[in-house]
Amino acid sequence: MTEYKLVVVGAGGVGKSALTIQLIQNHFVDEYDPTIEDSYRKQVVIDGETCLLDILDTAGQEEYSAMRDQYMRTGEGFLCVFAINNSKSFADINLYREQIKRVKDSDDVPMVLVGNKCDLPTRTVDTKQAQELAKSYGIPFIETSAKTRQGVEDAFYTLVREIRQYRMKKLNSNEDGNQGCMGLSCIVM
């Protein structure tokens, strides 16, 4: 069974835990209890493949920002979550993305941009804005509601698909790099 290490990042109060718990336990938590760090595991079938999702739900509060580098190192893919009724959380997405790229030492990291709380009528971040940001990053964008479950599975499953593509790309580039060697080792003296 293939394991995928997913990390849920974003500002405090955007619904990272609510999304994760909705996926894992099929239930909505509506009281706000700031997370320090929680880990969840769930076996699912995505595109006919049985997968083990290892999901790290992270702290959005600034006082826990020192912990971010560590979990960003271990994560394979990232759900970058903002709340559609919180423009600051949307602006913060770039900070998370830049930190992920720095820690991973790569511009090519599997990510999905997630606009949560789409069930609320008080939108301050336009869907088009988010779509344009995701397009500029070259990543998918999905609107979700942890309350109604809209888009929840889609967000996590899309991230798994992004990780799969990334793994295949790395595998293919490694194979391409080895073609000229014909399995022989070279020593430079």
Curated annotation (Swiss-Prot):
Pfam families, A to Z: Ras
Signal peptide segment: none
Covalent lipid sites (S-farnesyl cysteine): C186
Lipid attachment in record (S-palmitoyl cysteine): C181
Catalysis: reaction(s): GTP + H2O = GDP + phosphate + H(+)
EC number in record: 3.6.5.2
The keyword Amino-acid biosynthesis is assigned to this record: no
Keywords: Cell membrane, Golgi apparatus, GTP-binding, Hydrolase, Lipoprotein, Membrane, Methylation, Nucleotide-binding, Palmitate, Prenylation
Regulation: Alternates between an inactive form bound to GDP and an active form bound to GTP. Activated by a guanine nucleotide-exchange factor (GEF) and inactivated by a GTPase-activating protein (GAP).
Location (main, coarse): membrane
Membrane topology: Lipid-anchor
BP GO terms, sorted: positive regulation of endothelial cell proliferation; Ras protein signal transduction
Transmembrane segments: none
Disulfide bonding pattern of the chain: none
Superkingdom of origin organism: Eukaryota
Binding site for GTP: 10-17, 57-61, 116-119
Localization (cell): Cell membrane; Golgi apparatus membrane
Propeptide: 187-189
Gene Ontology annotations for the cellular component aspect, listed alphabetically: Golgi membrane; plasma membrane
Entry GO MF terms: G protein activity; GDP binding; GTP binding; GTPase activity; protein-containing complex binding
Residue interval(s) of motif Effector region: 32-40
Nucleotide-binding in keyword set: yes
Family to which the UniProt record says this protein belongs: Belongs to the small GTPase superfamily. Ras family.
Function: Ras proteins bind GDP/GTP and possess intrinsic GTPase activity.
The protein's name: GTPase NRas
Protein's organism: Gallus gallus (Chicken)
Gene name linked to the record: NRAS
